[in-house]
């Protein structure tokens, strides 16, 4: 009887352990995306995004590797030739967002600078690095 109980405990531990590994692996591979529309020009990491629709994509696996993890495309699809800017974001814990949020500040009259963005349902916000040299890739 003791050996059966021990076997069941070991089996449960293995099952629980494997589930947590799968969850951790799926979080690393997670990609999030959202489309937003700007009604005026916005500066993002030194690049001016003109009025229009943009796709924001965040790749958690790239972030874990220290690579550029944020990609912003003109339009609503991740088309390479429509890539406007990519960079390695700075994660910030925030309250859970009910919708996709853009946080920006007016740096001078008529100039709005995007400082961070947060996906719906997430508690992690993605801040834009303050240095233009931090993991930047700009397509002009």
Regions found by a protein language model. Name each.
Residues 43-44, 73:
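A general beta-strand register signal
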């Amino acid at each position: 009887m003791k050996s059966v109980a021990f076997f069941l405990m070991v089996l449960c531990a293995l099952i629980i352990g494997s589930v947590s590994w799968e969850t951790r692996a799926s979080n690393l591979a997670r990609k999030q995306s959202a489309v937003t529309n700007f009604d005026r020009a916005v500066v993002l990491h030194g690049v001016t995004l003109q009025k229009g629709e943009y796709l924001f994509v965040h790749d958690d696996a790239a972030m874990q590797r220290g690579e550029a993890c944020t990609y912003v495309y003109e339009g609503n699809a991740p088309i390479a030739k429509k890539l406007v800017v990519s960079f390695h974001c700075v994660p910030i814990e925030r309250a859970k967002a009910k919708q996709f949020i853009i946080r920006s500040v007016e740096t001078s009259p008529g100039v709005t600078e995007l400082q961070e963005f947060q996906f719906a349902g997430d508690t992690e916000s993605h801040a834009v690095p303050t240095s233009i040299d931090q993991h930047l890739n700009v397509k002009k």
